[in-house]
Amino acid sequence: MTFMLQIYCKNNNSTREFPEGSSLLDIYNGFNLTMPYGPVSAKVNNKVESLDFRVYYNKDIEFLDITSSSGMRTYVRSLFFILVKAVEELYPQGSISLEHPISKGYFCKLHIDRTIGLDDVQRIKQKMQEIIAADIPYTRTESHTEEVVRLFEKRGMMDKARLLDTYGQLYSYYYQLGDTVDCYYSSLVPSTGYIRLFDIVKYYDGLLLRIPSRENPTKLEEVVKQEKMLEVFQEYHRWNQILGISTVGDLNVACNHGHATDLINVSEALQEKKIAQIADEITHRNQDGKRVKLVLISGPSSSGKTTFSKRLSIQLMTNGLKPYPISLDDYFVNRNDTPLDENGKHDFESLYAVDLPFFEEQLTTLLNGEEVELPRYNFTTGKREMSGKKLRIDEHMILIIEGIHALNPALTPHIPNENKYKVYVSALTTILLDNHNYIPTTDNRLLRRIIRDYKYRNYSAEETIARWPSVRAGEEKWIFPYQENADAMFNSALLFELAVLKDYVEPVLRKVPNRCPEYSEAHRLLRFLNYFVSVQDKELPPTSLLREFLGGSSFQY
């Protein structure tokens, strides 16, 4: 006798019975759902699963397409596996690595014994199209971790072998696409035919894997030039290779062998060196007759802008300058005057949450050598107040203006460019899970923010995760379009960082109840953090950027 399950589908708000052991794809078809771009995965009791996942108990299910962030991650993983297979078939002695997101796509490196040409790109694209047309199934196999490690060692895939060997789990799984074996750490689509749209083009010394737009999946994302961002990523990838730490498996092995302190010291020293170089460049501009009066520091949420500005100020002081910090937060309009977003909620990420006329008035007065009384924003009352602090700048002073809109030309439209030095700060994660699995830079910042919000603002992880999509939307609209305007880019991510954040953020994430929608993201982050060996923060210096989020900083915030 077949046991029947009660399955609730969130997509159409209905419940139906299905036989025990039905796959998610069977359930999708049974509900007669029509998703214009097709399902690519599903949330089962708020946990993301592949469509071949079988159900043995009553469940709540929500099917996902590529208009969701989770669905797009599934699509990209599946697409990259196709690229891996294409390269394996075309270049048996070569390999491909997925380095990082850039220009609304993904930067990849083809490792062969010669410089790649346009004909190589065309061959790869054609082979990928053939693999998609063949509609080859992705198959998942679970086995003892020791056996999976040996499998990857035999194939020369030491990055995956090291990661799984240090993972600490009894069982691990791997995927196959025909004869091609690989490891991906979350859901894939059922078969290659699910991949409808992509492109691959030559991009500097590598390849750019282009993907559909989440807003309009019938079109590819437009390529956005990000030369400075690419340069920063590649510089740090070179540093990682010099240190011998390119993947999480490398990091885990180093930490297990007692080298965590060395990694902390070298990473912190590298950051301090970069900050000193930026301070020197500002000083040299002053000596060349280009009087820098403003240092504008921008970056997305939880990028470490505040600590960076304090450390830069110290370096400027060692060069004989007198920096004075000004936070754009103190120039917010009163909360009642804050613009509203499309959902009718206060849009604190909007440029117009800043009182632009008042800011420009005070800035002009200061630059004319006159005195102003600085404001202070009272976040409790939601009103701007005058602080009682008076400021007049002299020829040795530089204003350090920090805030998410600092690089927006509309903030300082009447200040000559030669009087401004612009810095973009972000946590650009350059370590990889393995050569085929990158770590999203947004994950790094989200983990920082969860810790900070819980520790200092009394927000739960559930609340921070719920707010994150609107924060990201604000970044896409107000911050990222201006990042290439920067005179300098500073990467605030530290090589060992995620291993240190792990012990702080895991207990907070575990408090998210599985009945709430945010559980899906909390569960994903917990699974991701499982791959890291923990590193204690006792060796972190008090001036570390991480101290802004963890506590124990010698700076006042």
Language model features: what each stretch is:
Residues 2-104, 113-114, 123-127, 229:
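Ubiquitin-like/PB1-type beta-grasp interaction modules and other compact soluble beta-rich domains
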Residues 308, 312:
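Hydrophobic positions on the alpha1 helix immediately C-terminal to the Walker A/P-loop
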Residues 324, 333, 337-380:
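Conserved nucleotide-sensing/catalytic segment adjacent to the nucleotide-binding pocket
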Residues 53-72, 95-273, 278, 283-288:
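Auxiliary tRNA-acceptor-end handling modules of aminoacyl-tRNA synthetases
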Residues 295-297:
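Hydrophobic anchor at the beta1->P-loop junction of P-loop NTPases
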Residues 359-418, 468-482:
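Glycine-rich phosphate-binding loop used to anchor ATP phosphates in small-molecule kinases
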Residues 305:
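Conserved lysine of the Walker
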